[in-house]
Amino acid sequence: MSFLKSFPPPGPAEGLLRQQPDTEAVLNGKGLGTGTLYIAESRLSWLDGSGLGFSLEYPTISLHALSRDRSDCLGEHLYVMVNAKFEEESKEPVADEEEEDSDDDVEPITEFRFVPSDKSALEAMFTAMCECQALHPDPEDEDSDDYDGEEYDVEAHEQGQGDIPTFYTYEEGLSHLTAEGQATLERLEGMLSQSVSSQYNMAGVRTEDSIRDYEDGMEVDTTPTVAGQFEDADVDH
């Protein structure tokens, strides 16, 4: 596979926590062979007997877990999901550019499974993975905790450099209006009153009951409808 490279295994300088020999690596269901798994603080690496292998950066690892499914042909193993693309180098050209573009919109996911010959080592492998992963938090998770809204600077206010937002009740707001503002408010209220009361002029008839209902809080007018006025209307039940 094209992504397999030759590199020195991580050592104590990289914070090596666990070295597990005789561990089979499986990529998306395809076996890569048996080698040694290195769980270090800097990266997760696997090398086969010939010195070829791969390394995974922790920020790209979205999930790691222990699989206890004994019905799986691999048996118990360490499962690792990576948000990156690892595959054999394809020799076939892409037939459709549109199909290639659609693949770019989907985040690539690769599944690795590490199967040690010594199943009792799985717990220690998982614990080491947890410790190393905690050293590399997801930057997106940190950004989501940031508040994008405008914040009130308490310290600046204590130093006399900030303003406290002012809130008024309805009555307090009226007292802060200028004479011109009060006149404008009265004019708007009058227009609103005329607009609402005009809704009670059915067929050109305005009754005292409709005015009283409006003044009492917009009650429903139960006055019988003039016979024949809406007989031709279609009603959906």
From Swiss-Prot:
Keyword Nucleus recorded = yes
Q: Which GO terms describe its biological process?
A: cell volume homeostasis; chloride transport; mRNA cis splicing, via spliceosome; positive regulation of mRNA splicing, via spliceosome; spliceosomal snRNP assembly
Keywords in alphabetical order: Acetylation, Cytoplasm, Cytoskeleton, mRNA processing, mRNA splicing, Nucleus, Phosphoprotein
Q: What InterPro entries does its record include?
A: ICln, ICln/Lot5/Saf5, PH-like_dom_sf
Phosphoserine found at:
S102, S144, S193, S195, S198, S210
Which Pfam families has this protein been placed in?
Voldacs
Subunit: Component of the methylosome, a 20S complex containing at least PRMT5/SKB1, WDR77/MEP50 and CLNS1A/pICln. May mediate SNRPD1 and SNRPD3 methylation. Forms a 6S pICln-Sm complex composed of CLNS1A/pICln, SNRPD1, SNRPD2, SNRPE, SNRPF and SNRPG; ring-like structure where CLNS1A/pICln mimics additional Sm proteins and which is unable to assemble into the core snRNP. Interacts with LSM10 and LSM11.
The record's annotation in PANTHER family points to:
CHLORIDE CONDUCTANCE REGULATORY PROTEIN ICLN (PTHR21399), METHYLOSOME SUBUNIT PICLN (PTHR21399:SF0)
Q: What is this protein called?
A: Methylosome subunit pICln
Q: Which organism is it from?
A: Homo sapiens (Human)
Lineage of the native species? Eukaryota, Metazoa, Chordata, Craniata, Vertebrata
